[in-house]
Amino acid sequence: MTRQAFILSDCEFSECGEKPYALLTANPTKEHHYIAQTEQRQHAHNPQVSPQNQNVYKLPLSMFREPAAARRPRSGDKVRGGSESRGAAASVNIIGNLAAKNLYTLTFVENTANQYNLESWFNRHESGYEEACNHLRTLQECRLKTGETDTVKVPDALWRILRLKFLGILRNPHNHKNLFAHRLHEAVRARLPEVGFEFVRLISKRDPSRIEAIMQNYRFSFLGYVDWLAGLYGMLSEGVAQPSLFERLFCTIFAEPDAVKIELFRYAENEGLCLFGDSSFCLQASPKLISVGVNISHDMFAVVHLQTDRWLAFKNTFHHDAPKLEGRVRIIDGDQTQRLMFNQLTISQAHEAVFGRSPNAEDYLEAV
């Protein structure tokens, strides 16, 4: 039987017998988030309201170029959504935040409001995020000792979160010219079998005038956008490869535990807040080590340290298989130096803004 990269269908998953993970179901979703709503809700300043009404604070980068005294709200000042000015925080609704219209559209269904997009394939990785975060908060801190006694086996909850975070780096349109993300995309594109180029054919038929805003806002050329989006479809499709190329890529990153170090930093309610940026990650690199920082919630972030030699080598072999995930993590509570460094890196590597639970810059940049 001819191999299919995807199946376009209006039926439910249970009604479609073969290749359920290659199935794309038509849906009316037009607002496509490149940082998932479930991730953003971990920073909601009004978590007591229904999910569709939850907000986060958007802090433009200009806020952090002002003296501390100028950043502090004056008595009586109010922070409201829709009233953002230069250097001022704004409360923004998560439903429309860090999203773009038709960003991940493969094709439209004629004479209907529906389209085929990455919604269901992303949902596989986004589901269970809140529960995974809650589980990480229950883990016991690793008291620094010697050898392996200061680490614990990576729980499934952390693997789930890290998988979504690495996908977030790749699906974020701000990152298509970022060297780290670009090289990952190139590695995947080089391993796409011929069947995966069916995505290129379909996406390239889209009317350029309908994606003009995407090209302008994220500095894509038309062909650059087509290649980037087709790469996302190709790496996630289990019709192209099973396990998917993305799953193989992710698992291979951690295939040699001795070459990877994972750290989880957590903070109690009175120990300060963590930011997340519109770039989805922050990075530090040296000739010997690459450190990738990802926000998890308002009170947690993780850092994955990769030996540079290993990082350069695995991109040539990841497509062979998806090795079993194994590794250890060090859990550290209340480290203010690391929190401030993470927040500063997040700010310095953001594109337009950072986001969090508080409108005050000092809550992210001062030790508690």
Question: What does each model-found stretch correspond to?
Answer:
Residues 2-368:
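Alpha-helical structural context detector biased toward long hydrophobic helices
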